[in-house]
Amino acid sequence: MLELNDIKKDYVSGSTTVSALKGINLRFRDCEFVSILGQSGCGKTTMLNIIGGLDKYTSGDLKINGVSTKNYKDRDWDFYRNNSIGFVFQSYNLIPHQTVLSNVELALTLSGVSKAERKKRAIEALEKVGLGEQIHKKPNQMSGGQMQRVAIARALVNNPAC
């Protein structure tokens, strides 16, 4: 479960401070599917970056399974990202000279998973998104929707919670 308690995020540039988040309070239940909607510039991406440990909040507290992240170190965030969540970015950033399979395996390579296990899990993730027959293609041989599904497979390959 994730809890955001009075989360605030300020960006400072010189003498100017911009408040991106102003006291956000949310609670996400385990395995809950959530959509974050809002106008451009309202803080959706900032909030998701904080939840994903890609950005730090200015004040408040983010709790993961009831544990405060106020004192999290980089290694704690790395463990959380590698074992609990999967990211699908708006720009999927696939590596053009690598195959679809290699792109999905990349996250596991960074986590130190064996080659055989990487391949097995990457193929399973690609099959889940309907691309099991496309593993040897390069990103430029796929449609935009297919590339987005590769990015989804890349997010699923680490077996995020739920």
Regions found by a protein language model. Name each.
Residues 2-162:
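ABC family nucleotide-binding domain
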